[in-house]
């Protein structure tokens, strides 16, 4: 009898482990499906007196790219974003995530700025609201 409780706990933990190991860690279900986009109001990278807000994106199909000067994969995708920015039917916006403003400005100056506007999110709060877990 004294072994039944630890055995039961072990079996339950083993079942959770078995189910958890079967899940794909790359598949994250979006918490925003069928919900309105969260509101935001952030200064722009290139002009902190100007703001970018959710309302600026309404009424048109927009692509919002989350990027940072320290992000390696952002450097790889940047040439594609530069090409996309030349197409008239794509509204491309950036969300600079957890970065330093001077580094972000320097990165855009060095590599080119494909965005109609890029919001500056130094704390990462807006990115988290949109489900960003990394760049």
Regions found by a protein language model. Give the residues of each.
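Thiol-based oxidoreductase modules, predominantly thioredoxin-like and allied folds used
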Residues: 90-103, 113-124
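A short beta-strand-turn-helix
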Residues: 40-63
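Thiol/disulfide oxidoreductase modules built on the thioredoxin-like
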Residues: 2-3, 109-114, 121-135
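Conserved redox-active cysteine motifs that mediate thiol-disulfide chemistry
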Residues: 66-83
């Amino acid at each position: 009898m004294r072994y039944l409780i630890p055995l039961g706990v072990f079996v339950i933990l083993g079942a959770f482990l078995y189910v958890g190991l079967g899940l794909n860690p790359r598949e994250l279900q979006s918490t925003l499906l069928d919900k309105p986009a969260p509101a935001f109001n952030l200064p722009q990278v290139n002009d902190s007196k100007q703001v970018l807000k959710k309302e600026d994106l309404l009424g048109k199909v927009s692509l919002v790219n989350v990027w940072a000067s320290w992000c390696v994969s952002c450097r790889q995708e940047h040439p594609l974003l530069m090409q996309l920015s030349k197409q008239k039917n794509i509204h491309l916006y950036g969300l600079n995530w957890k970065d330093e403003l001077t580094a972000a400005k320097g990165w855009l100056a060095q590599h080119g700025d494909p965005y109609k506007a890029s919001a500056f999110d130094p704390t990462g709060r807006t990115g988290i609201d949109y489900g960003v877990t990394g760049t």
